């Protein structure tokens, strides 16, 4: 049975895979992206191009005003993006306080207005140690809340919650996906840096899968 679902779609490889998984499952997909003032805003351009190509309804919502009260992240503030492997100590500076709770809340509101039954988002196990709002206990409790917060229950669904980025890429390749249509780098430059934690984790996923990353790097 076809269901309406909202997919939180950043333009990165995880949410790109989630978007395509929802489509291949036959759902009526509505993609939702957020401009929260991230320096890697190029991901939104990539997301728009993909949705146009797939003929998926897509909204980009500007919520950058939240930075008037939320700060301290290297993704939004004038703080250097850490280089090196994707590890807790170095990557903590990339945390945007309460980001996923904000994004999920807005996505659930959109889902209710569309009469959609689920919100898909791309949390995965590689993020558990670093980002509290990607951990299973957070996803479960958000799901519990979103089932009772409105007259119409909405399920929070994270298909790769217990999988690594390596697993996500493996699944995406099996689906025939083209990862040149994604953006991962946290630095807001024309080409991916290849040095930040996000790039390092992406490159590792391709290496383990015996594949060459189609993106150009500096």
Curated annotation (Swiss-Prot):
One of its GO terms (molecular function) is ATP binding. Pathway: Purine metabolism; 7-cyano-7-deazaguanine biosynthesis. ATP binds at residues 9-19. It catalyses: 7-carboxy-7-deazaguanine + NH4(+) + ATP = 7-cyano-7-deazaguanine + ADP + phosphate + H2O + H(+). Its cofactor is Zn(2+). Belongs to the QueC family. Catalyzes the ATP-dependent conversion of 7-carboxy-7-deazaguanine (CDG) to 7-cyano-7-deazaguanine (preQ(0)). This is 7-cyano-7-deazaguanine synthase.
